[in-house]
From Swiss-Prot:
The keyword Transport applies. The gene is sw. It is found in: Cytoplasm, Cytoskeleton. GO terms for cellular component: cytoplasmic dynein complex; lysosomal membrane; microtubule; neuron projection; nuclear membrane; protein-containing complex. Keywords: Cytoplasm, Cytoskeleton, Dynein, Lysosome, Membrane, Microtubule, Motor protein, Nucleus, Repeat, Transport, WD repeat. Belongs to the dynein intermediate chain family. Pfam families: Dynein_IC2, WD40. One of its GO terms (biological process) is sperm individualization. High levels of isoform 1b, isoform 1c, isoform 3a and isoform 4 accumulate in early egg chambers and at stage 9 become concentrated at the posterior of the oocyte. Isoform 5a and isoform 5b are highly expressed in adult head and to a lesser extent in adult torso. Isoform 1a, isoform 2a and isoform 2b are found in all tissues examined, including ovaries, midgut, torso and head. This is Cytoplasmic dynein 1 intermediate chain. Residues 75-85 have a biased composition (Low complexity). Acts as one of several non-catalytic accessory components of the cytoplasmic dynein 1 complex that are thought to be involved in linking dynein to cargos and to adapter proteins that regulate dynein function. Cytoplasmic dynein 1 acts as a motor for the intracellular retrograde motility of vesicles and organelles along microtubules. The intermediate chains mediate the help dynein bind to dynactin 150 kDa component. GO terms for molecular function: dynactin binding; dynein heavy chain binding; dynein light chain binding; molecular adaptor activity.
């Protein structure tokens, strides 16, 4: 019942609001009609002669004279005035009040009045000026088109005058008399809507109505932002001179040193660039003999990397190329016996792209670094295997040059020199494989170097440990690997499975094996079983994983052969270096008795390591004095032709047949 009573009260309240709204609207209409009639009556003070002429004209046309119309309007005005002066409550309001009290609405007694009004405006007077044909802003003295002489001018002024805002004023004032919309262009405020835009909208025109005439265009001052205001208010501060202690603190801060190192590298690269602006691409600047010599040069020296402090008297022990930045090569260096105060192990990163003579990064360790490699799946990490048996990790993003992580010296890890270090796997599953000279293979994760994930003892006949000196994985292989040892034998092994450990033993060299390289050309998987070994017995041997005997032995060297490496793009090309300072390039499709190209490094230093650039157009070698040489390989020798693979397959078959005949 309370709910029903509440609904009834709300309905009664809404009905009362509607009645009150109707009453106000009717009162406003009556008041407007009174004022309009009063103004029309007041405006009747026209010249009597004109009024008389007008009445005669209307009578001749059969229209009621103006005097009769004014008298009828005055009678209506008197009636409405009487009704308004009584100030008795409206019948609708009484009905609403009674409805709220008694619950019933009384019928309304309404009456209809027919009022006939006739208004004929006089002839309009048009006034033009010589300057403009638009209404002057803000005043009515210079109007181009004026209608103030009309009897309706007072009515229009009252129509557009400001009124007190109500919830229903928009509909009452602007929409209930659509017949008067044409008078908009004759109002005094037609230009005021464009005036004082900076102070808000002051136009009296209804919403949606556009003004007529040309607007007044003025210059607008540019906007002032808070920052400009703040700058104006700021007082110029005096520069305080730093003391020597404060300067030293800034210089020794980590951020300042990092900035100096990075900015110095950029400036050094810019200053080291030596571009020949007189290069003649037509070829008229060089003689024909010089061009012929350059085109026929199989090997030509490109760069020599050497640092007076860190490279001097240090033998290069290993090299590796970055997979993220192909122009970067890292080299590991042995200790310098003449400088006992310097770190024993040094690793330097060189840039082959820019003509700068200093390394990109220099890292050092307390023990001599015997092997190093880039982290394949992280461009900032560098790994190193030390003479003490530790695996160390450097990061070029940190300021310090010492390792950020290292493996422990314990029986669970390596305790002998680590000559073999390589990362295998994929982006989401990769491991670091290391082998020490005591025949222990360890698998590491970069996230945890505190202990190896897996270990394997490499033993021959379960009795004697194998001293491994070199290691290589065949193409697309992460489980099987081939190894060279100090006793001259070649071993194949597996990391996992039922046959984990040493699987096969191949015929031996007459001396320790110094280097091993597998055929990793990706275009022909038929050659994935091939690998090369070098030894101090002055020979290079070609092997197949399918046969325990060598396929061929290259015996052209007259000194220790220290390293060998297959070309990454050519199926039949490999490089080798020896202790006499000679670099040899062998193309098995051309000759197997003598090298295709050979060169002796200036000074004939003992060459220790050789490596190809990823493009196969350059070969990099390191010597015993700490110098790293980059040689350009002729394109006709480095780049294979279309039939190189088929030719190499044919020559390989011939080599196998000759090997079987010798047996």
């Amino acid at each position: 019942m309370d709910r029903k009573a509440e609904l009834e009260r709300k309905k009664a309240k809404l009905a009362a609001l509607r009645e009150e709204k109707d009453r106000r609207r009717r009162e406003k209409e009556i008041k407007d009609m009174e004022e309009a009639a009063g103004r029309i009556g007041g405006g009747a003070g026209i010249d009597k002669d004109q009024r008389k002429d007008l009445d005669e004209m209307l009578s001749s046309l059969g229209v009621a004279p103006v005097s009769e119309v004014l008298s009828s309007l005055s009678s209506v005005n008197s009636m409405t005035s009487d009704n308004s002066n009584t100030q008795t409550p409206d019948a609708s309001l009484q009905a609403t009040v009674n409805g709220q009290s008694g619950g019933k609405k009384q019928p309304l007694n309404l009456s209809v009045y027919n009022v006939q009004a006739t208004n004929i405006p006089p002839k309009e007077t048009l006034v033009y000026t010589k300057q403009t044909q638009t209404t002057s802003t803000g005043g009515g003295n210079g109007d181009v088109l004026s209608c103030h002489s009309s009897p309706l001018s007072g009515y229009m002024e009252d129509w557009w005058r400001p009124r007190k805002a109500h919830a229903t004023d928009y509909y009452d004032e602007y929409n209930l008399n659509p017949g008067l919309e044409w008078e908009d262009e004759f109002t005094d405020d037609e230009e005021s809507s464009l005036q004082n835009l900076g102070n808000g909208f002051t136009s009296k025109l209804p919403p949606g109505y556009l003004t007529h005439g040309l607007p007044t265009v003025k210059d607008v001052a540019p906007a002032i932002t808070p920052l400009e205001i703040k700058k104006e208010t700021e007082v110029k501060k005096e520069v305080n001179e730093l003391s020597e202690e404060q300067k030293q603190m800034i210089i020794l801060s980590e951020n300042f040193q990092r900035f100096v190192v990075r900015a110095g590298r950029v400036i050094e690269r810019a200053l080291s660039e030596n571009v020949d602006i007189y290069t003649d691409y037509i070829g008229g600047g060089d003689s024909e003999e010089a061009n012929d010599e350059r085109s026929h040069a199989r090997l030509s020296l490109n760069r020599v990397f050497y640092d007076e402090r860190w490279s001097k008297n240090r033998c290069i022990t290993s090299m590796d190329w970055s997979t993220h930045f192909p122009e970067l090569v890292v080299g590991s260096y042995h200790n310098n016996e003449e400088s006992p105060n310097e770190p024993d192990g040094v690793v330097m990163v060189w840039n082959t792209k820019f003509k700068k003579s200093t390394p990109e990064d220099v890292f050092h360790c307390q023990s001599a670094v015997m092997s190093t490699c880039f982290a394949k799946f992280n461009p900032n990490l560098i790994l190193g295997g030390t003479y003490s048996g530790q695996i160390v990790l450097w990061d070029n993003r940190v300021q310090k040059r010492t390792p950020i992580q290292r493996t422990p010296l314990s029986a669970a890890a390596h305790t002998h020199p680590v000559y073999c270090l390589q990362m295998v796997g994929t982006q989401n599953a990769h491991n670091v494989i290391s082998i020490s000279s005591d025949g222990k293979l360890c698998s590491w994760s970069l996230d945890m170097l505190s202990q190896p994930q897996d270990t394997l003892e490499l033993q021959q006949r379960q009795s004697k440990a194998i001293a491994i000196t070199s290691m290589a994985f065949p193409a697309n292989e992460i489980n099987s690997l081939v190894m060279g040892s100090e006793d001259g034998y070649v071993y194949s092994a597996s990391r996992h499975g039922l046959r984990s450990g040493v699987n096969e033993v191949y015929e031996r060299h007459l001396g320790p094996i110094t280097g091993i390289s597998t055929h990793y050309n990706q275009l022909s998987p038929d050659f994935g079983h091939l690998f090369l070994t070098s030894s101090i017995d002055w020979t290079i041997k070609l092997w197949s994983l399918k046969d325990t005997k060598p396929l061929y032995s290259f015996e052209d060297n007259s000194d220790y052969v220290m390293d060998v490496a297959w070309s990454p793009v050519h199926p039949a090309l490999f490089a080798a270096v020896d202790g006499s300072g000679r670099l040899d390039l062998w193309n098995l499709n051309q000759d197997t008795e003598v090298p295709t190209a050979s060169i002796v490094v200036a000074g004939a230093p003992a060459l220790n390591r050789v490596s190809w650039t990823p493009s196969g157009l350059h070969v990099c070698i390191g010597d015993e004095a700490g110098k790293l040489y980059v040689y350009d390989v002729a394109e006709n020798l480095a780049q294979p032709s279309r039939d190189e693979w088929s030719r190499f397959n044919t020559h390989l078959s011939e080599i196998k047949m000759n090997q079987s005949d010798e047996v």
